């Protein structure tokens, strides 16, 4: 646990009692603060009381008298589409609002670091797609290379549940826009921006607000090194803003398709090969086609980001290459479930938006595509240029009929349910084809989350194998 410092003897309100909320309460208590907990759910409140915490109704008048800080969970809106009433009450009372990420950065460093031979480092990864894989890949490379490392944030443990840092340890954090938007302190040693595509726009008031939330990780006084994906305009802009000149090697540009040889430091992938260039010279090359856990151009971008981050931490190219080869990938992200009669079944349930689905559709030459769910603004119209590899689509969920209207000349069938979609795709698939779940939609119409959707797909596939 990371005890929260600087709030000794003060009352701190905690809103939202899921994993991060309860971890925050424990860390506040360990640091000497008095946490006051609240959640709209009676079950969550009862669970907190059962663990010995004080539950206080933060919706009542004058609830924030003598409260030093409100700490809120990332899923609770603080501005758009409308502030949560408890957060609005705190802001009206002049009480600062923070989250567990902000508390982590104010409390992570301790006095005993003076005795360390090598200071602990923090690497933060943000972006629209590829965050989890990139974070897990950095963590895996460090562990395989013998560096002490922990992983947390939007993946793994809550940040305040981490163990105190050891000599030379690297903490790798995946941060969503919800987390970067509200944290009052963001001071990573290395920050990674993978890419940007429309997502969570209702929470940020539009695309500009969404990008601004991500960009906070790179504010002045932020990272010593920045790894920036430049395959979208926002990444190009951010890299330019952070660089004093093209040869500035504090910014490492990465790409899954462009040659970037003219910059001070760059890592890019073309035709399945990763190349590192620094000050006009090629430093390393890796054949990514030999990495079974990293299929497709989107995973090659993730590999570039992880490679660049690990190079800033002092790892050698060959160390990184060996670790890339042993990476198994993450569940629900280009996950090979099995093969039957020459047909592969791939679970990419995490492809919840158009951009991530487009990357999945570019990874295989012949696809039986299972798509649908709770569609997002614009549906799948933007995917039309990426449907050439789709032999047929099998549409499920709330948006099945809307998606059917946007399929153009691509063959498709409305299946409604995962069960029928898997059966029909398996019946019609030919050797050499891939049955791919890449929904391009949220899961909440039929499942509690994308993980449960992916598990359902895998169970139904395994029943056929």
From Swiss-Prot:
Catalytic activity reported: UDP-N-acetyl-alpha-D-muramoyl-L-alanine + D-glutamate + ATP = UDP-N-acetyl-alpha-D-muramoyl-L-alanyl-D-glutamate + ADP + phosphate + H(+)
Gene Ontology cellular component annotations, sorted alphabetically: cytoplasm
EC identifiers of the protein: 6.3.2.9
Compartmental location: Cytoplasm
Residues holding ATP: 127-133
Keyword Disulfide bond found: no
Keywords, sorted A to Z: ATP-binding, Cell cycle, Cell division, Cell shape, Cell wall biogenesis/degradation, Cytoplasm, Ligase, Nucleotide-binding, Peptidoglycan synthesis
Signal peptide location: none
Cysteine pairs bridged by disulfides in the record: none
Pathway assigned to this chain's UniProt record: Cell wall biogenesis; peptidoglycan biosynthesis
Database matches in Pfam families: Mur_ligase_C, Mur_ligase_M, MurD-like_N
Major localisation: cytoplasm
GO biological process, one term: cell division
Record's function text: Cell wall formation. Catalyzes the addition of glutamate to the nucleotide precursor UDP-N-acetylmuramoyl-L-alanine (UMA).
Family from the record: Belongs to the MurCDEF family.
PANTHER family: UDP-N-ACETYLMURAMOYLALANINE--D-GLUTAMATE LIGASE
Name under which the protein is recorded: UDP-N-acetylmuramoylalanine--D-glutamate ligase
Annotated source species: Cereibacter sphaeroides (strain ATCC 17025 / ATH 2.4.3) (Rhodobacter sphaeroides)
Gene symbol of the encoding locus: murD
């Amino acid at each position: 646990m990371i005890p929260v410092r600087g709030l000794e003897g003060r009352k701190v309100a905690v809103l939202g009692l899921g994993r991060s909320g309860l971890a925050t309460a424990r860390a506040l208590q360990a640091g000497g603060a008095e946490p006051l907990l609240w959640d709209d759910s009676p079950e969550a409140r009862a669970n907190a009381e059962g663990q010995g915490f004080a539950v206080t109704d933060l919706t009542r008048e004058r609830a924030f008298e003598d409260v030093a800080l409100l700490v809120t969970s990332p899923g609770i809106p603080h501005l758009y589409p409308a502030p949560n009433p408890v957060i609005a009450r705190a802001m009206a009372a002049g009480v600062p609002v923070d989250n567990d990420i902000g508390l982590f950065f104010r409390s992570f460093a301790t006095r005993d670091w003076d005795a360390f031979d090598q200071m602990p480092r923090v690497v933060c990864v943000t972006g629209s797609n590829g965050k989890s894989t990139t974070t897990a890949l950095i963590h895996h490379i460090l562990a395989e290379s013998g560096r002490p490392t922990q992983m947390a944030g939007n993946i793994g443990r809550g940040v305040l549940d981490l163990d105190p840092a050891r000599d030379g340890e690297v903490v790798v954090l995946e941060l969503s826009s919800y987390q970067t938007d509200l944290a009052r302190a963001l001071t990573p040693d290395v920050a990674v921006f993978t890419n940007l595509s429309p997502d969570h726009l209702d929470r940020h008031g539009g695309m500009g607000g969404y990008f601004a939330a991500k960009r906070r990780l790179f504010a002045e006084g932020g990272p010593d090194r920045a790894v920036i994906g430049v395959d979208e305009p926002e990444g190009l802009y951010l890299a330019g803003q952070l660089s004093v000149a093209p040869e500035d090697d504090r910014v490492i540009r990465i790409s899954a398709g462009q040659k970037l040889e003219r910059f001070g430091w760059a890592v890019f992938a073309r035709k399945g090969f990763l190349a590192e260039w620094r000050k006009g010279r090629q430093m390393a090359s890796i054949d990514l086609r030999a990495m079974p856990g990293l299929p497709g151009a989107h995973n090659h971008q993730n590999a570039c980001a992880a490679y660049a981050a690990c190079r800033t931490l002092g790892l050698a190219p060959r160390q990184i290459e060996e670790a890339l080869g042993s990476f198994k990938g993450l569940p629900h992200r280009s996950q090979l479930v099995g093969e039957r009669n020459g047909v592969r079944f791939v679970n990419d349930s995490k492809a919840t938006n158009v951009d991530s689905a487009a990357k999945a559709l570019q990874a295989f030459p012949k696809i039986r595509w299972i798509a649908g769910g709770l569609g997002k603004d614009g549906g799948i119209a933007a995917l039309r240029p990426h449907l050439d590899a789709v032999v047929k689509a099998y549409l499920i969920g709330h948006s099945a009929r809307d998606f059917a209207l946007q399929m153009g000349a691509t063959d498709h069938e409305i299946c409604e349910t995962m069960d029928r979609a898997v059966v029909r795709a398996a019946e019609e698939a030919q050797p050499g084809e891939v049955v791919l779940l890449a929904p391009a939609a949220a899961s909440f119409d039929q499942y509690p989350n994308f993980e449960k959707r992916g598990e359902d797909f895998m169970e139904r596939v395994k029943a056929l194998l």
